[in-house]
Amino acid sequence: MSAYSPLSAQLDADTDVDVESTRTEGRRKMEWTLQHMPILQELRARFAETKPLAGETIGMAMHVEAKTANLVELLALGGAEVAITGCNPLSTHDDVSAALDSNENVTSYAKRGVDEEAYYDAIEAVVAHEPTITIDDGMDMVYAIHEDHPDLLDTIIGGAEETTTGVHRLRAMDEDDELQYPVFAVNDTPMKRLFDNVHGTGESALATIAMTTNLSYAGKNVVVAGYGYCGKGVAQKAAGQNANVIVTEVEPRRALEAHMEGYEVMPMNEAATRGDVFVTTTGNRDVITQEDFEVMSDGAILANAGHFDVEINLEELSELAIDTYEARDGVQAYELADGRRLNVLAEGRLVNLAAPIALGHPAEVMDQSFGIQAVCVRELIENKSSYDAGVHNVPDELDREVAEIKLEAEGVDIDSLTQTQSEYLDSWSHGT
């Protein structure tokens, strides 16, 4: 077992922390969010009765906050032993992590504000539990297992990946024939991407930016880098708050889609001369660079809602700056030689999770995403022989199962196909 300690042990060693009150506050947050997560509530009832995950060990690298914690406890209720750490050094809520670590079937290593060495030590600590299932947000755990612990690959049933960046990494790994066990691309299934990516990212990113800066969007030029599902959500929600939205893209069809939906579309360096607020949503690196910083207006706000802290090139910005200082909690100002100040939120990390005031996506949308995660884990265990190594789409029947639970919870009834309609749709012989 790794020498890296679970959070409870770390807090016990800190005489300035009241561990019990910290756990109580974390539990209070978890209970509040669970009230607004009817899918997880229903799955808790099912998993508690059938114990579909009995005997399995689940290793997780996720954003450890209240909504994620309810997924963790659902998996534990289903019979699994769960070890978890963070997938971002700044996104963990320590009170929630402490509450999780008090569950006898859960070990949490997640702690906010760790350095790079401790971040990867915590991942190693989770891997030391020898998981049979992995759940990732960004693919760091899958990578660590393949790179440093290939001896575990034969005993891993499969995994699930939460986010766009992680799925991109997994597909690249799969194309190189390096991925050695099946992983569900949870990010790509409709019940995740149409809600979590659009409404979750759009609402939480803009809300966090507004609360962190205490500024309005009305009348401002908001530049959205990337027009995938996350970028669409940010653009849509910003326009709804009376911002003028400018989109930058590298993919011609997405650029055309943004144009046809009424947004201005232009290269980043042109948008840089006009933007008041910049939000990156690409999952790629060097989206905003030195040539863009050089033409931005004084007071520009820069935030990342994509994934890793490489979308805004902070190394180049630091080289341009003659001074840097904390302008406000969660806001780092970079003063340039000509007196302009460019303001970076949350150190360029995921603003909706890493900013000091951040709470992540709304509970209702994460309920759907985490419902998919839970049924994917169940599917891997129940039908393990059906999946070869590689990236797999979430089976449609699982996506529909979660949608049906949500509709029932919302009190929404829908029609069903008649037998005649089903036969018509399945037939190829009907013409005009």
From Swiss-Prot:
Main location: cytoplasm
Region of interest: Disordered: 1-24
GO CC annotations on file: cytosol
Top-tier EC class: hydrolase
Domain of life of the organism encoding this protein: Archaea
Keywords tagged on the record: Cytoplasm, Hydrolase, NAD, One-carbon metabolism
Metabolic or biological pathway, per its Swiss-Prot or TrEMBL entry: Amino-acid biosynthesis; L-homocysteine biosynthesis; L-homocysteine from S-adenosyl-L-homocysteine: step 1/1
Gene Ontology biological process: L-homocysteine biosynthetic process; one-carbon metabolic process; S-adenosylmethionine cycle
Compartment(s) where it occurs, according to its Swiss-Prot or TrEMBL record: Cytoplasm
The keyword Metal-binding is annotated on this UniProt entry: no
Record-linked PROSITE patterns: ADOHCYASE_1, ADOHCYASE_2
InterPro entries: Adenosylhomocyst_ase-like_sf, Adenosylhomocysteinase-like, Ado_hCys_hydrolase_NAD-bd, NAD(P)-bd_dom_sf, S-Ado-L-homoCys_hydrolase_CS
Record field: catalytic activity: S-adenosyl-L-homocysteine + H2O = L-homocysteine + adenosine
GO molecular function, one term: adenosylhomocysteinase activity
Cofactor annotation: NAD(+)
Pfam families: AdoHcyase, AdoHcyase_NAD
Protein family: Belongs to the adenosylhomocysteinase family.
PANTHER family, A to Z: ADENOSYLHOMOCYSTEINASE
Matches recorded under NCBIfam families: ahcY (TIGR00936), PRK05476.2-3 (NF004005)
Protein name: Adenosylhomocysteinase
Organism: Haloquadratum walsbyi (strain DSM 16854 / JCM 12705 / C23)
